[in-house]
Design a protein with these regions (language model features):
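A detector of single, family-specific signature residues
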Residues: 1-193
Length: 193
């Protein structure tokens, strides 16, 4: 695969690369040597960073392969999401329930109370570990796509009239309960079902 196909995640191929090159040749470019040097330096930096990212992802893959966590058995759970979730939560015995993990991630509903007034439109708190919240959100989207049980649950919540993000937050709570159960029991998803 060429670098444009890789960088565009498969959206553009060789034809688009040729089209871009021809457009660049036909366009009016700067003849200043400083700009050319800056462009070469920037390209070199991008290539070095891409190489470092590949090394880090390889290291993460090796660590996850050694740990072999049960949450990877959930259809749709990716290695990077699993790594962030496990790293942010750490020791699952520090949490007495899945709700504590949700609160730690800042995914529990906020409450507003003043005198006799109680907030009836609770919003997600968005306190806590934003990395865990982001990883759980992304993992939930993929799990809902690849796992028929979660896809059905998300469709059910949408049929109840809930906004997509609200329905997804319900699926996220379900996913956290599943992750908690799998990690505590050591069972894989297929054997737990």
């Amino acid at each position: 695969r060429d670098s444009l196909t890789t960088a565009s995640k498969g959206r553009y191929g060789k034809e688009k690369a040729i089209q871009i090159r021809e457009a660049a040749r036909a366009s009016i470019g700067s003849v200043m040597p400083a700009k050319s040097l800056e462009l070469k330096h920037t390209i070199k930096l991008i290539q070095e960073l891409a190489s470092e990212i590949d090394e880090i992802e390889d290291s993460i893959q090796k660590i996850i392969d050694e740990l072999n966590p049960p949450i990877l058995s959930i259809p749709g759970m990716g290695v990077n999401s699993a790594a962030v979730i496990l790293a942010e939560i750490g020791d699952f015995s520090n949490f007495s329930s899945p709700d504590k993990i949700l609160a730690y991630a800042g995914c529990s509903p906020s409450t507003y109370q003043s005198g006799k007034l109680t907030n009836c439109y609770a919003h997600m708190e968005k306190r806590g570990s934003r990395y865990l919240r982001h990883a759980l959100y992304n993992a939930t989207k993929y799990v809902c796509y690849w796992n028929p049980v979660f896809a059905e649950y998300l469709a059910k919540k949408r049929a109840e009239g809930k906004h997509y993000n609200v329905a997804l937050s319900h699926a996220m709570k379900k996913l956290v309960r599943l992750i908690y159960a799998l990690q505590k029991s050591g069972k894989t998803y297929l054997t737990a079902a």
